[in-house]
């Protein structure tokens, strides 16, 4: 860590030299999952799409997952229905969860001036638009879509 900050000012160097075990905290994300379920096990939230914290959307995504999954599970009356509910949940939720994983990583790179460099106008433009897809999601429409898919014959998935 000291080598990484060797060109910084004396204040930063003094702080780092006072640390007993200086290290850099690593941030991890889950590689894109090919599915959110297997058999009778279905994942949601961070178990399905663990991500870096830069969007601040992890808990919200988990709640959204729970909303969709619960709306499907209340229709299930058998083990076969459970599999169908998981298939539909996976198709509806996986793209959004994985988009958050990728987007959050990009946001971290943006915060560290790795995406737009130091062009503050480009950074500002990116910041003002990048989270709209999270904030403006129509969850009622997503529930309706999931239930419609669930009620269709299996061959349509």
Descriptions of predicted regions:
Residues 1-24:
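Conserved FAD/dinucleotide-binding core of flavoprotein oxidoreductases
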Residues 2, 102-120:
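Charged C-terminal helix
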Residues 7-12, 96, 107, 114, ...:
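Short secondary-structure junctions and interdomain/linker hinges
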Residues 9, 26, 134-136:
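Short linear interaction motif-like sites in intrinsically disordered regions of transcription factors
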Residues 9, 52-55, 138:
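Secondary-structure junction/capping motif
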Residues 12, 16, 77-80, 100, ...:
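Secondary-structure transition/capping residues
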Residues 22-106:
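Conserved mid-domain beta->alpha element of the FAD-binding
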Residues 47-50, 67-77, 87, 91-95, ...:
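C-terminal lid/capping helical subdomain adjacent to the catalytic/cofactor pocket in oxidative enzymes
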